[in-house]
Amino acid sequence: MKLSEFVKAEYGKSISECTNEELYYALLTLTKKMASGKQHGNSKKKLYYISAEFLIGKLLSNNLINLGIYDEIKEELAQNGKDICEIEEFENEPSLGNGGLGRLAACFIDSIATLGLNGDGVGLNYHFGLFRQIFENNMQTTVPDPWLTEKSWLTKTDVTYDIKFKGMTVKSRMYDIDVIGYNNTSNKLHLFDVESVDESIVEDGINFNKEDIKKNLTLFLYPDDSDEAGRILRIYQQYFMVSSAAQLILDECVAKGCNLHDLSDYVVIQINDTHPTMVIPELIRLLVERGLEMDEAIEVVTKSCAYTNHTILAEALEKWPIYYLKKAVPQLMPIIEVLDDKVRRKYHNQEVYIIDGEERVHMAHIDIHYSSSVNGVASLHTEILKNNELHHFYEIYPEKFNNKTNGITFRRWLLHCNPQLTELITSLIGDGFKKDATQLEKLLDYKNDEKVLKQLLEIKSAKKMELKKALMEKQNVTINENSIFDIQIKRLHEYKRQQLNALYVIHKYLEIKAGKKPSTPITVIFGAKAAPAYIIAQDIIHLILCLQQLINNDPEVSPYLNVVMVENYNVTWAEKLIPACDISEQISLASKEASGTGNMKFMLNGALTLGTEDGANVEIHELVGDDNIYIFGDSSDTVVERYAQGSYHAAKYYNENAAIKEAVDFITGEELKAIGDKDRLERLFNELVFKDWFMTFPDFDEYVKIREQAYADYENREEWVQKMLVNIAKAGYFSSDRTIEEYNRDIWKLED
């Protein structure tokens, strides 16, 4: 059905007579109708991809692209004086995720559907997400981030389950979002919500009564866990998600004729990080309840589950006190004790026990012992897991460990966010790359084609203008579109080292003040949210915002250097920032970033990576070669060794390196104190000088040197654009379609 006919039937008027809001809701309804007619994966075995987050982004354009009607709709709207981008402004971005974990899950379910595989996502229907970030007085403040409207991509289902906690039962209801594959199957994202949820209990900012479980359970993603009530709420939340999922899985299996003894022939559960771990003991509990012996239930569940590890950070490998679990979900503890007892009888090594000497349950240990597969998400990360962090487990289960390097959906991160580049690529090599991203390699034939290289630069300039316009409209910030766009966008964490980037900005500011001006102006752009309880991360944001105010208002410096921090960084912002970027900052401390996927998105859009040998940067480096990437910093081996020996002392670097001392002293100098919060700046200064846990200082000199090298190379436009082309051509490996094909081949074994 043409849009004009649908609009006529819906509103009784033509497209040109409709408001943009009416057209948005018409397109929403039409798209959902078309998705419902798509075939769902129907193999005997089904995947359930369980994740605490799905950072899916706005869905309208993405769904129209995947249905194959985007160009047709865009053209029909344009003929009636309507702009699809303006219509999309009426869509709220779903507040269902925060960082790379959630974005990866979103890319994966897109690829699962595109490949025609039988697999659904399972998560929670958060009402307010993490939070909406607002900058006030150069500080991050937090308010709820509502996204649910009466009409949305969510469809309420009749599926409900009783979820039993200690002393109470709550009802969960399933809501579905269609996951439309590219010219293929349509699957589901199942999101569970508590029926008794009450948005009105949120008070000032994002504060609420953490103990009112019946009302608060699905309000926020990752509720503040700086106190006991917050930590126990996380257990309630996680159990609510996995108990709903487990009941759904068993119901769907029985409906297919499965006798539960053969569960693993019908089901594979991918556990995305440790948040869904309790699905293992919960499934065992339910199977025993339904008549299986304990040992058989354990065996069946182990065969059915697979675990993805996303981090080596100890803080993120969840360990819950037994006391918390008994307070919230006492019915799970007998199962967990049985699982631990089995491990203790077999392996006499307390490093691999599930319950430790401090009466804590290690969630990752449950996942490793009672899953059939354990995977890392980049080759370096997987090697670190095998040789260091999870070495004791690797010695026990070498056959379980495997690598699945992360990927991204090219539908969103190229076709949707950079249609100009998509059009150019299609004109050169055809559209086969849309289904087989490795075909991008054909672009290498054009490495010396002046016309093509000129078009690439023109597209980059156009995307810079679009970003300039967006920043002006959204934040009233002006940037120079002819400057180098140097961008770091990711969750705020010390290991990702936004503080290193900020120290470089100070260094550059002082250089310009001393008369050393760059040949081409530089715009340094940040986007990041800091967890409300993560004080130092908030202090780093404060420093960046103070630098933004200081530098952008300095007439001596601002013609050459600008700093911008985008407010409330999310997928929608990423879609504007990534195509406009020249230099992609991927500067985590080597060994700490499992993979990263922002690095892949930037590469695909022709940005050059400036980074450490960490995560997927290693594989990008291998693909593009030394000449097309900017690598600096200590190796992961050096870093791991330094931690092991306890040999790093930040104060020594501070006292012995004049450039470091000058930049760090500036944090508490008069200029910043005049506009910033003295306590925050001093706390950050002390953290860097006396702790610097993520080793900013050892990499500082090399970082300055390589960044200056990148800026110098940018001056040679012909060579720079050739580097851009090589990066785009080599990005095909990082398609999430490739990643999902590997998961299916090695772990899931679904028929397509």
Each PLM stretch: what is its role?
Residues 1-752:
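A conserved ligand/cofactor-binding region detector
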